[in-house]
Amino acid sequence: MKCATIVCTIAVVLAATLLNGSVQAAPQEEAALSGGANLNTLLDELPEETHHAALENYRAKRATCDLASGFGVGSSLCAAHCIARRYRGGYCNSKAVCVCRN
């Protein structure tokens, strides 16, 4: 009986918390939608800014080959990485980049 009371109390508190959070979030969403001119989209950015953002976020596929090569398991990790991505395996090439097989 005590267990059921505790579970019901926790459920009521969680429901009240979630309901309160959704009610408070609604005015912010309405304010964002009403100020449509202030929304930032990808089309608002200049191509040069987009290019620089892409270069900042560029990441070469070298982690499995470079970092694991010191332990002698680079090709095995590369093959496992490629199998996880639904390829038939993979290997580390001469530039220490993981190459997945079709």
Swiss-Prot record:
Principal cellular location given in the protein's record: secreted
Stored CDD domains: DEFL_defensin-like (cd21806)
Chain coiled-coil ranges: none
Propeptide residues per the UniProt entry: 26-62
Biological process, per Gene Ontology: defense response to bacterium; defense response to Gram-positive bacterium; humoral immune response; innate immune response
Induction: By bacterial infection.
Claim: Secreted is one of the keywords in the record: yes
Record annotation: effect of changing residue 95 to R: In strain: Gbjo3a
InterPro entries: Defensin_invertebrate/fungal, Scorpion_toxin-like_sf
Similarity-based family: Belongs to the invertebrate defensin family. Type 1 subfamily.
Function, as annotated: Responsible for the anti Gram-positive activity of immune hemolymph.
Name of the protein in its database record: Defensin
Organism per entry: Anopheles gambiae
